[in-house]
Amino acid sequence: GIRTKDGVIYTEAMIRRTDIMNEMIKPGEVFKLAELLPYSEGKIINMDIVHNDKMKFVVMAFDEGTGLTEHAAPGEAIIFALDGEGIISYEGKDHVIKAGENFCFAKGGMHAVKASKRFKMALLLTLE
């Protein structure tokens, strides 16, 4: 099992040889997802970590006041809040999300993301 003083987040993704891993991720090196991208004033920055024809894992950095307009999720998805605070609008209801928290979308779920403060998140998206 896993035991920690402050809790743990465990995510497992099977990476096949046909998957494309971002070259910034080095085998055998420790890294923090939240530190892969900087914040940029007035902008949203994103970077694919790994993807294939069935899934995508992306890290995004939102400057305060930026956001994504409402759209339908192209597949099932999980958001991992990495830093700061954001607002996830899902099916007409707002949900505040902070670093260490997660949120799930169903395929087709209408959602938007707003950064009430600077906000970094990772997104695991199925593409089937």
Residue ranges and their predicted role:
Residues 7-54, 89:
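A short, N-terminal "cap"/entry segment at the start of jelly-roll beta-barrel domains
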Residues 43, 56-73:
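Conserved short histidine dyad/triad with adjacent acidic residue
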Residues 85-87, 94, 110, 120:
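Structural motif
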Residues 82-83, 98-99, 117:
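A cytosolic small-molecule/anion-sensing beta-strand core signal
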Residues 61, 74-87:
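Short, conserved beta-strand element in jelly-roll/cupin
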